[in-house]
Amino acid sequence: IDGSMGHRQAMSAVNMLWNTNGYFWDGRAEKLREQSIMPIQDPIEMNETLENVVEKLEQDTLYTHQFFRAFGTDDITSYRISLALEQFMNSIVSYRSKYDLYIEGEATFTEEEELGMELFFEEYNPFFPQTSGADCGHCHGGKNFSSQEYMNNGLDTLYDDNGRYDVTGLESDRGAMKV
């Protein structure tokens, strides 16, 4: 908005259905429906009010019809907007990617893709750094490549972004972000 830049990258909206531990990098939203309307009101993201969004949607018969189909009423509220956005985001599911098919034995990787997977999942060996893995899989495991935890990767000693600490106030959460 007006050239403003946020201080974090957007998280993936894929496979939110299986998220079990907060939303946003710092976990400040407990439920997806809460997360869905926060960017609307953020001055750097959409810089809008829910009241204005409701008013705009009420002026478009396409939306009033869709709200009637979804909720049995054409009464548009910010809560119903959050529910609609939540359902939409829960529908964005990855289940037929090449990786998914590879895991199911229905696809093969190229040599380069195999090397990438080895690099991702193999442990780092400080005695052979040129030939060891990047050790990503310890934290980014499972089908969604997420542990659902908040961790500090330890790269910084001073933090420009306090991460989870700003939500919990716990010193142990300083610099921690959702994995």
Where do the language-model regions lie?
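Short glycine/threonine-rich turn/loop motifs
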Residues: 1-37, 100-179
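Short, exposed beta-strand "edge-strand" segments with a Pro/Gly-rich flavor and a Y/T-containing core
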Residues: 6-12, 24-30, 42-48, 57, ...
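Post-cleavage N-terminal segment of exported redox proteins
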Residues: 43-126, 141-149
